[in-house]
Amino acid sequence: MNKLIDFSKGLVPVILQHAQTDSVLMLGYMNEEAYQKTLKEKKVTFFSRSKQRLWTKGETSGHFQHVESIHLDCDQDAILIKVMPQGPTCHTGSLSCFNSEIESRFKIQALAQTIHQSAKSNQSNSYTQYLLKEGIEKISKKFGEEAFEVVIGAIKHNREEVINETADVMYHLFVLLHSLDIPFSEVEQVLAHRHQKRNNFKGERKKVQEW
């Protein structure tokens, strides 16, 4: 890919994107030397315009950006690198440098990221940490309880209750997945496969009494 990138025109903008959540993490710049170092070490290195030198992201904080894949845009003058961040990306301690929201829309992947960060935090009053410490049986029980609440709300035709309880179900599902070390991306892959697969009808299901 480096043969396709024309570094003779100056620094090339580089966008870092979380490999699992697709969150945009930061914007930096590379010269050819920084790019080659990134390829070799599999950790993102920029060319710092303020320091006027190569700068490996995380060299001071330890919050390295581990390369998962590298993509070049159609004009071959910008790079997208999907990474697994080792800690917060922003120097402020935030997960992303893009925190000044002009307009935002919640994405389900953000829930997984929030749970992941809560699990690593030292907050003694964290409900997420409490569930993870209690273990998979406790988490599974809570997930089942919340799912049953959705059923009750649906039977009562209580729209608001169904919405609220569904949110609780999603939260406990993501805690369960985290506890089992299952990234949501693997669930998405199964859904994508089923969506693309034709003639996926499996026939009539047996009634519960016949199972």
Curated annotation (Swiss-Prot):
Alphabetical list of SUPFAM superfamilies matching this protein: all-alpha NTP pyrophosphatases (SSF101386), HisI-like (SSF141734)
Catalytic activity, as annotated: 1-(5-phospho-beta-D-ribosyl)-ATP + H2O = 1-(5-phospho-beta-D-ribosyl)-5'-AMP + diphosphate + H(+); 1-(5-phospho-beta-D-ribosyl)-5'-AMP + H2O = 1-(5-phospho-beta-D-ribosyl)-5-[(5-phospho-beta-D-ribosylamino)methylideneamino]imidazole-4-carboxamide
Gene3D superfamilies (alphabetical): MazG-like (1.10.287.1080), Phosphoribosyl-AMP cyclohydrolase (3.10.20.810)
This protein's UniProt keywords: Amino-acid biosynthesis, ATP-binding, Cytoplasm, Histidine biosynthesis, Hydrolase, Multifunctional enzyme, Nucleotide-binding
Superkingdom, taxonomy of origin: Bacteria
One Gene Ontology cellular component: cytoplasm
Segments of this protein annotated with the region Phosphoribosyl-AMP cyclohydrolase: 1-107
GO molecular function, one term: phosphoribosyl-ATP diphosphatase activity
EC numbers: 3.5.4.19, 3.6.1.31
Sequence segments annotated as region (Phosphoribosyl-ATP pyrophosphohydrolase): 108-211
Listed GO biological process terms: L-histidine biosynthetic process
Pathway: Amino-acid biosynthesis; L-histidine biosynthesis; L-histidine from 5-phospho-alpha-D-ribose 1-diphosphate: step 2/9; Amino-acid biosynthesis; L-histidine biosynthesis; L-histidine from 5-phospho-alpha-D-ribose 1-diphosphate: step 3/9
Main location: cytoplasm
Subcellular localization, as worded in the UniProt entry: Cytoplasm
Group of enzyme by EC: hydrolase
PANTHER family: HISTIDINE BIOSYNTHESIS BIFUNCTIONAL PROTEIN (PTHR42945), HISTIDINE BIOSYNTHESIS BIFUNCTIONAL PROTEIN HISIE (PTHR42945:SF9)
Family, per entry: In the N-terminal section; belongs to the PRA-CH family.
UniProt name for this protein: Histidine biosynthesis bifunctional protein HisIE
The organism of origin for this protein: Staphylococcus epidermidis (strain ATCC 12228 / FDA PCI 1200)
